[in-house]
Each structure stands twice: as C-alpha cells, then as structure tokens.
Amino acid sequence: MKESIAKVYRKTGETEIKSEINLYGEGKYDIKTGIGFFDHMLNLMARHGLIDVKLEAKGDLQVDSHHTVEDVGIVLGESFKKALGDKKGIKRYGTSFVPMDEALASVSIDISGRPYIVCDFNFTVDKLGEMDTELVEEFLRALAFNAGITLHARVLYGKNNHHMIEAVFKALGRALREAVDIDERINGVMSTKGTL
C-alpha cells in the first residue's frame, strides 16, 4: 500500500498544534482539539477520506474557538501539501455529493496550486456545541489556502444544522480521496503546463 506521510508542528501565541497524516491510509483518526463538535467533524473527514490523521491542538479556548479552528485548518492544509509532494499521478480533481438525512452537501476540489474558496451555506443557528457555525468556512479557507487547492463547498438544502455540516465534512473527505487517487495512466501531473 502506498503511503504519503507528513508531520507538521506549529506554535503561536494562540495555539500549539501537532499533526501527522497519511493521505493513503485507512481512515484512522486520533484527533483532540478541545472542541468536541469540531473533533467529530474532523473524524468524519478522515474516515470518509481514508486519510489517517493524528492531531493534537491546544488553543486559547477561554477566548473562543476561532483561533483553534482556523489554525487546525492551516496545519492540515500544510500537511496535505507536504504529503502530496510533487503531485505526480494524482487525479487532481474530486467532487462528492453527500446526503445526511434531509440535508445534501457538495464539495468540489482542484489540487491546482491556486488557492481559492467558494462557500454557500445558510446555517440557521450560531453554535453547535462550543463551535460557531461560521467557523466551518474559516476552517475550509485556512485548509484550502495552505494546501494550495481550489475548494467549492455548498449545502444544497437541509434543516438540521448538524446534518448540514456533517454532510460537508464527509463530502470534503470523499472529494479529497478522489483527487489524491493515483491513476497510472497519468504521466507526470494532470496539467498541460507540466506543473501544479
């Protein structure tokens, strides 16, 4: 089985985070951010992406969860970029639609080296557990910009905010899994420019 492992450590005045990922894993996870709902979502991303993730974050949660969530996105983005290496043979694009009961979400990504994000969410509550729902977009932005990917995430419809966000994180994992999949027919990288 192919492995693509990356370790990243980041310490600031607000957070301290260490991460180890294997892009071609089995979906094993050991994630501790101090934010229960966020841990649950990251576990889902790892499991459905078949990405092994070990991550421990200590943040200034006495302030709020913003710094921790955003900085976890930064560290995971850096980890993905490092684990991808030269990107030879990867399919580059991934799209997933995931239903969660009454909710439906989609995530499309392009491992292009050109970070960009578009989110279309209409959450109807401010918080789930200790996590502000607006931080879903902050996490995705930090992830995309530090991984060097274009990411479009959308909740097409839904009523239960937990279900909507859960569908987004599952779709993120599945889209990543598709994009990093190796196709032996690809000579070099999937670009006419010869670089990603």
Swiss-Prot record:
InterPro entries, alphabetized:
IGPD_sf (IPR038494), ImidazoleglycerolP_deHydtase (IPR000807), ImidazoleglycerP_deHydtase_CS (IPR020565), Ribosomal_Su5_D2-typ_SF (IPR020568)
Gene Ontology molecular function terms on file: imidazoleglycerol-phosphate dehydratase activity
Q: Does the keyword Lyase apply?
A: yes
Read off the Gene3D superfamilies from this record: Imidazole glycerol phosphate dehydratase, domain 1 (3.30.230.40)
Instruction: Write the record's keywords in alphabetical order, separated by commas.
Output: Amino-acid biosynthesis, Cytoplasm, Histidine biosynthesis, Lyase
What residue intervals traverse the membrane? none
The record's listing under HAMAP family reads: HisB
Q: Name one GO cellular component term.
A: cytoplasm
Extract the Pfam families matched here. Answer: IGPD
The pathway that the record names for this protein is:
Amino-acid biosynthesis; L-histidine biosynthesis; L-histidine from 5-phospho-alpha-D-ribose 1-diphosphate: step 6/9
A GO biological process of this protein is: L-histidine biosynthetic process
Q: What class of enzyme is it?
A: lyase
Q: Which SUPFAM superfamilies match?
A: Ribosomal protein S5 domain 2-like
Provide the family line: Belongs to the imidazoleglycerol-phosphate dehydratase family.
Q: Where in the cell is it found?
A: Cytoplasm
**Per its UniProt record, what PANTHER family does this chain match?**
IMIDAZOLEGLYCEROL-PHOSPHATE DEHYDRATASE, IMIDAZOLEGLYCEROL-PHOSPHATE DEHYDRATASE HIS7
**Highest taxon of the lineage:** Bacteria
- Indicate the segments annotated as coiled coil, or none if absent: none
Catalyses: D-erythro-1-(imidazol-4-yl)glycerol 3-phosphate = 3-(imidazol-4-yl)-2-oxopropyl phosphate + H2O
Name its species.
Clostridium botulinum (strain Langeland / NCTC 10281 / Type F)
Q: Which CDD domains match?
A: IGPD
Protein name per its UniProtKB record: Imidazoleglycerol-phosphate dehydratase
